[in-house]
Amino acid sequence: MVKNAFISVRVQEKKEKNSGSVEFQVFRFTNTIRRLTSHLELHRKDYSSQRGLRKILEKRQRLLAYLSKKNRVRYKELISKLNIRESKNR
């Protein structure tokens, strides 16, 4: 992933006022997941990072499941905006 993409994400994070919203949390987890994925491409045997990545993926999946139950429209907008695949269970 390109470093400039992370910089633009950081700027968006600072502009966001409601850091407790589900959308913002999913956005932050997605950014962290992408960063860890690019790290693991270089360091395949970094098992601590692999474990952390799995934990963050699970947290994001739980938040997305919650959002899809509460507001399906916001869920669809978020996954299309962040380019995330929809869960198989939904």
Swiss-Prot record:
* Compartments (UniProt record): Plastid, Chloroplast
| An example molecular function term from Gene Ontology annotations | structural constituent of ribosome
Q: Which SUPFAM superfamilies match?
A: S15/NS1 RNA-binding domain (SSF47060)
Just give the chief location class.
plastid
Fetch the Gene3D superfamilies from UniProt: S15/NS1, RNA-binding
Pfam family name, one: Ribosomal_S15
Cellular component aspect of the GO annotation:
chloroplast; ribonucleoprotein complex; ribosome
**UniProtKB keywords:** Chloroplast, Plastid, Ribonucleoprotein, Ribosomal protein
Q: Which GO terms describe its biological process?
A: translation
Q: Which family does it belong to?
A: Belongs to the universal ribosomal protein uS15 family.
Q: What assembly does the database describe for this protein?
A: Part of the 30S ribosomal subunit.
Give the protein name, as stated in the record: Small ribosomal subunit protein uS15c
The organism encoding this protein is: Citrus sinensis (Sweet orange)
Q: What is the lineage of its organism?
A: Eukaryota, Viridiplantae, Streptophyta, Embryophyta, Tracheophyta
